[in-house]
């Protein structure tokens, strides 16, 4: 499809994510087609629900040409009270959850906790 269609898809995905999260949450693009969302003061159950809502919205409304776009989502948590916890461990767990989604058929949400 080319760069123009890819850019269009990424913008649409961002818009769908933005309307699915709260103002206190943050969306970051961390790679070509990879994003991170920080859900402030959100437990794993609520994060999974938000992830599923985002996945369903994108599956329903984002397309390039005749092809529907799907996403895979990985979720993990960060415990501020655990002194051995750090951002690198959180990112690694979340990345592992993402690859679990990708390895099990894509278009799904996976959770790995500490």
Feature locations, PLM:
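Nucleotide second-messenger and two-component phosphorelay signaling modules
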Residues: 16-26, 62-66, 104-105
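Residue-level recognition of strand-loop junctions within catalytic nucleotide-signaling folds
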Residues: 38-42, 59, 78-79, 114
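Conserved long alpha-helical elements within nucleotide-processing catalytic cores of c-di-GMP signaling
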Residues: 1-19, 28-32, 36-37, 44-52, ...
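Catalytic core regions of nucleotide second-messenger enzymes
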Residues: 29, 57-74, 102
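Catalytic-core segments of nucleotide cyclases and related cyclic-nucleotide turnover enzymes
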Residues: 44, 48-51, 78-112
């Amino acid at each position: 499809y080319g760069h123009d269609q890819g850019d269009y898809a990424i913008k649409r995905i961002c818009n769908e994510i933005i309307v699915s999260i709260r103002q206190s949450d943050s969306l970051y693009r961390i790679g070509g087609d990879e994003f991170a969302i920080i859900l402030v003061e959100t437990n794993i159950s609520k994060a999974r629900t938000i992830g599923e809502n985002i996945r369903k919205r994108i599956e329903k409304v984002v397309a390039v040409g005749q092809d529907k776009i799907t996403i895979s989502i990985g979720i993990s948590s960060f415990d501020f009270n655990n002194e051995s916890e750090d951002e690198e461990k959180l990112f690694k767990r979340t990345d592992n959850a993402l690859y679990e989604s990708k390895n099990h058929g894509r278009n799904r949400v996976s959770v790995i906790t500490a």
